Amino acid sequence: MSNAAQDTVKNVLFLCTGNSARSIMAEAIIQREGMGRFRGFSAGSDPKGAPHPQTIALLRHLNHDVTHLRSKSWDEFAGQDAPQMDYVFTVCDNAGAETCPIWPGQPISAHWGIPDPAAEDGSQARIGLAFHDAYRMLRNRISIFVNLPLAQLDRLSLQRKLDDIGMTKDHEDPETA
């Protein structure tokens, strides 16, 4: 891989059905964890119209920039004028099972299923814990991803590593598991 290709900022799209919690969190996490090497996006097959208030509150509490976060349809990323994605990750089982649009540029994709914190209907403490758990799982997986030696991996090896990340328990690193 050329140095120019290694230096290019990689576009990463995170998908879930409602685009209100997990995919929004992942977009914010990779913006920060990616250290300028990755640009995060998120979308949903049936977007809720706005990020979940608990998502925004948690991200603000953790000092993420939430200024540009919004709930949007994955159709925004399937058109000719959309930014070309290098990676597409589904973060919910519903989106993982849906027929996704054909993404321009043939990005590498993987499923990283995370339980939906917005589905928690217990006490405020349980809801808060569900959002924190989802954030932690996403941050762990994204941290592993952004630290992969991408320039040294062929497409098939990279696909295997991305699939392995999706199957990791939230406390494991696939490199040591």
Feature map (PLM): residue ranges:
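Conserved active-site segments centered on acidic
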Residues: 2-79
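Short glycine-rich anion-binding loops that position phosphate/pyrophosphate groups of nucleotides
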Residues: 20, 93-96
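Residues at the C-termini of beta-strands that transition into short coil/loop
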Residues: 44, 92, 113-115
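Residue-level detector of flexible, active-site-proximal loop/helix-junction positions
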Residues: 47, 95, 116-118
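Alpha-helix C-terminal capping/helix-to-coil transition sites in glycosyltransferase folds
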Residues: 83-84
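Phosphate-binding/catalytic loops
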Residues: 99-177
